[in-house]
Each structure stands twice: as C-alpha cells, then as structure tokens.
Amino acid sequence: MAKLTVKDVELKGKKVLVRVDFNVPIKDGVITNDNRITAALPTIKYILEQGGRAVLFSHLGRVKEESDKAGKSLAPVAKALSEKLGQDVVFPGATRGAELEAAINELKDGEILLVENTRFEDIDGKKESKNDPELGKYWASLGDGIFVNDAFGTAHRAHASNVGISANVEKAVAGFLLENEIAYIQEAVEAPERPFVAILGGSKVSDKIGVIENLLSKADKVIIGGGMAYTFLKAQGYEIGTSLVEDDKLDLAKELLEKAAGKLILPLDHKVANAFAGYTEVKETADQNIPAGFMGLDVANKTIADYNTQLEGAKTVVWNGPVGVFENPDFQAGTVGLMEAIVKQPGVKSIIGGGDSAAAAINLGYAEKFSWISTGGGASMELLEGKVLPGLAALTEK
C-alpha cells in the first residue's frame, strides 16, 4: 500500500487520534456482536504499547434529532473495550467542549479515551456526515498531529471524523485493519492468482451493476446467486414465478449476459416456496424455470454441484452476497454448499466482502475457514467496483 501506516510514525508521548468502527448492534444496552471492537484491538494495542495516548472516534447508528440519541451512546462500547484491553477507557461522554479537552490533555502514555458518538454532531446541520470543515479542524486540534484511520467500514464516506481530521493533521496513516482490508480486497481484484472466481449474491441487480461490470473485466468467472439471479434468468426467457425481479433492469441484464460471453454463471435449479413468510409448500425445481405461484428462495442440488465444478482449482475467490435466504434453515443449503465448495479448494485465497455474507459465514460456523472476512460491506463493494475510497485517498503518501 502506497500510504503511510501506523508503523511509520513515532507515537511515544503523542496524543494519537484514531478513527475506529465501533458501529456495533446494541439491544437494551447490551452489545450483541462485538466483532468490530475485536477487529480494532491490534491497532489500539500497538499505539498503547508504543507509549501513545489514544483518542478514539467512532459513530454508532444514525442520529438525526435529539430523540435519536437514546440508545446511541458509546458508553456500552467503552465498557466492552475496557474489558477487552484490561485497562480503563476514559469516557467523558462528549464530542466537544472543555471537559473533553481537559480529559484528553490529562492522558498519560499508554492511556486511552473514547469520544462520544461522532454522529451526535449530525443533530445540528449534519456536521459529521457532511464533513463540516470547522468540525474536522476542531477534532484534529485535540491531538498532536497524528491521525490513524482504522475504520474500513466508513472509508467509502467523506466524514469529518475521517477525511476532515486527515486534512488538518501532519500525518494521516492507516491502521492494521484498514491496511489488511485494502491488501486482501484490492490485491485480489487487481492482481489475483488465477483462476479468479467472483461470486455475487444479494437481492438487487441495481445495487451491484458497477461491481458486476468491473469483475467481468477482471475475473475468470462470475457466479450470480440470490435474488438478483431471477432478473438475469427472466432476461434469458425463463419462468420465475413470483420471485423477486427488477423488470426495469431486464435490458441491462441482457447486455451484461452478452458482454460476459459465457463468464456469468447462473443457477441451474431452485428451492422454492409458495410465500416468503408463512409458506405452506416448499419444493425443488427440475430446472431453471420456477412454477407459477412459487418464488425462488435458495438454489438446489444441481446448482450446488455446479458450484463445486465452477470453483474447482480456483486460487482466488471473492464472495459478496448470500445465494439464498440463509437466515431461514429451510433456505440455507445453497449458501452452506457454496461455502463448502470454496473452502475445500487447496491453497485458495478466499475473501468475503462483508455484510450478509460475513454474517452467514460467522453464524453458520465457516468464518475460520476463510482467508479474510471484511468488516465493511459498503466499502468493500466500492473497492470491488474499482472506486477510490475517500477515507483512504485522504491518507498521507509514503
């Protein structure tokens, strides 16, 4: 990576500003999934071990008005982080002001402070989300000229707490998580070991047009599953019953199929039901057609066997989006079969691009078998699309 990283700067005795992604699910004050906190630990520990004084910034959820603040404080995160680090995490509960400034200035080497939810600044004019220049400058003034961005999950956004701070410090550098995310995803797409197979699931073609187009020019094969497969199948003239479809994208699907010249791999059969919820009948189809009154909710056995064939010998696999409604045990066999087919390839570099695919791998017990699971759904999508991430572009060149 051509950007400075946290290892390239002197940290001892410095107030080091760190953007992390602690946007974790919280229910009744309890964190239900702390993966993002765990993912940030290597960078935080390194800064503290080097004698830096860490000042952490993160958003949590969306905050548009005063009433949105309830349940959006980072207080539970400060507590969880303290337990993971085995040391106190100072939490003044503010995003600005004399109390916050005093607490930061009182930090000693190896100590840590967490600023309150950066999106509390969105209540008055969306200052965080719109990258207000004064806010970026103010937050930058709280440190000693070093900013570490370790929040890959927000790297595709230009906010005050990443791009804004970066513009007002001497050195803006990447943390270990951001560095790894870029290395795995960008290298997989730009310089893959071949054969390179991309797998795209999810519900809408419209969400992934740019990704499909970019990957068709880079990958040896692009496997399409999930809800968006039905738009492609309808474009080819197959019956899709009541399955999810984007009729306004049929011409685009035809164009992509022509451009793909055999590279796009679609399901060969389906597991269908007579309703999405409250269904009374589930069955498998004999081929690519889906009968009237039924909707496709997963792929079936012929397709799973085909996944094994298509992935045979693959050296690089990038997967974004499940191929069925994996949250429902009736419709998770396709996603499980796909994961099995990926992880059994010898010497494969296997990367999951965040979001629902990451949840599927974690919930179904496959996480440890993949080379890398991204922490940022939107950011990884934009990298797969070949876009430049603002949070990364704002970092200091080596």
Curated annotation (Swiss-Prot):
Residue positions binding substrate: 21-23, 36, 59-62, 119, 157
Family: Belongs to the phosphoglycerate kinase family.
Name the record gives this protein: Phosphoglycerate kinase
Gene expressing this chain: pgk
Biological or metabolic pathway of the protein: Carbohydrate degradation; glycolysis; pyruvate from D-glyceraldehyde 3-phosphate: step 2/5
Annotated GO MF terms: ADP binding; ATP binding; phosphoglycerate kinase activity
Subunit structure: Monomer.
Highest classification ranks of the organism: Bacteria, Bacillati, Bacillota, Bacilli, Lactobacillales
Binding positions for ATP per the UniProt entry: 208, 296, 327, 354-357
Native source species: Lactococcus lactis subsp. cremoris (strain MG1363)
